[in-house]
């Protein structure tokens, strides 16, 4: 990214995001029944959203958070999460609000929307963690082989990872310990949600076939308080200030800007991500109606869309060895805690529901993924300790 006209580029990202949401989705996709026109619009939305907006905003988040964490002493992953996770949270809240609006007139549709809200929120947690597991696994593989490995085999364009010994700036042991602790907290929060839904949230309604479970309001309030407490506790950075000589050209640009300007760019990047994700979620809803895909599947796919921004940031931190792998890991865990906080907000307004099968599968996968990531971080920590 060029060091000039950074603000202009971010405005362009927002313009594209708004164009996707209100022009392509609002004027074309939602107002046509022509299948080839709908297919073209869907392809265009995903191509521009992922290929341009997400990639561009991920770079901005990477550049701004490294400077901000030095100035504020907040963890880079904490700042990163607030740039990428709030759009996920807002999408879940919006789905829940729509669910509440139609609950008295169309209960089945209200429950389906609430299921989308839940599966979007927790589905994004699954993808975030599994993607981070893969990134750290590939880094550990590079460390074991003592050679550069591709992020994805056979795909050079996705970047590569160098052994830690070849990194000019390395993550600290303290960062790895902090990441493990944040992930442990996330695991406990996830288990709390699952257990609470099973013990206190069973819903029986003759209009709904099968078992249904709700994250009830009192549990939502407790969960919200716990999430805020965890975010506050782990807000501080465990990494030394970035070395000036290692700050890339774009970050040097931000290093010369006022803090208000950096916060503004970070916030605007989040807005661009929000509108792009909303466009993609609406696209998936239309696609679901066309193909008769179940709503819970649509919600889980929407969760993947919702976490693309975070995944791009983690990917960039992994293939660009500037000592920010620790920030990437903490950012993933913080991102998931923020989206869990979003689930708490949705529960407070009354809109988190899951069927028994999806409830079991989603939470088992999240807990398993958390365990795998903790294992990979432990291996990465051992590699750091063995570097001379």
Model-derived segments and spans:
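Hydrophobic alpha-helical segments, chiefly the membrane-spanning helices
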Residues: 1-388
């Amino acid at each position: 990214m060029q060091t000039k006209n950074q603000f202009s580029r971010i405005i362009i990202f927002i313009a594209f995001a708004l164009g996707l949401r209100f022009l392509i989705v609002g004027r074309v996709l939602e107002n046509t029944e022509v299948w080839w026109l709908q297919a073209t619009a869907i392809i265009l939305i995903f191509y521009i959203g992922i290929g341009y907006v997400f990639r561009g905003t991920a770079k901005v988040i990477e550049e701004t958070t490294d400077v901000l964490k030095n100035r504020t002493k907040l963890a880079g992953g904490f700042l990163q999460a607030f740039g990428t996770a709030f759009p996920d949270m807002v999408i879940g809240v919006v789905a829940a609000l729509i669910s509440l609006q139609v609950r008295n007139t169309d209960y089945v549709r209200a429950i389906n929307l609430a299921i989308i809200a839940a599966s979007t929120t927790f589905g994004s947690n699954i993808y975030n963690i599994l993607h981070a597991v893969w990134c750290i696994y590939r880094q550990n593989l590079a460390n074991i082989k003592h050679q550069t490995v591709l992020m994805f085999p056979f795909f050079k364009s996705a970047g590569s990872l160098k052994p830690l010994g070849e990194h000019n700036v390395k993550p600290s042991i303290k960062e790895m310990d902090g990441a493990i602790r944040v992930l442990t907290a996330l695991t406990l929060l996830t288990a709390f949600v699952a257990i609470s839904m099973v013990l206190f949230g069973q819903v029986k309604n003759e209009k709904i076939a099968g078992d249904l479970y709700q994250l009830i309001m009192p549990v939502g309030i407790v969960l919200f308080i716990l999430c805020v407490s965890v975010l506050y506790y782990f807000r501080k950075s465990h990494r030394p200030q970035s070395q000036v000589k290692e700050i890339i050209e774009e970050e040097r640009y931000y290093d010369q800007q006022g803090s208000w300007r950096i916060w503004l760019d970070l916030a605007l990047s989040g807005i661009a991500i929000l509108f792009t994700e909303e466009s993609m979620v609406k696209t998936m809803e239309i696609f679901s109606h066309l193909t008769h895909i179940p709503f819970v599947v649509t919600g889980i796919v929407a969760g993947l869309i919702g976490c693309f921004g975070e995944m791009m940031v983690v990917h960039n931190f992994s293939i660009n060895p500037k000592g920010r792998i620790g920030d990437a890991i903490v950012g993933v865990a913080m991102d998931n805690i923020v989206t869990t906080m979003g689930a708490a907000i949705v529960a407070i307004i009354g809109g988190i529901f899951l069927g028994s099968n999806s409830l079991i599968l989603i939470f088992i996968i999240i807990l398993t993924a958390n365990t795998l990531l903790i294992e990979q971080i432990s291996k990465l920590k051992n590699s750091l300790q063995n570097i001379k």
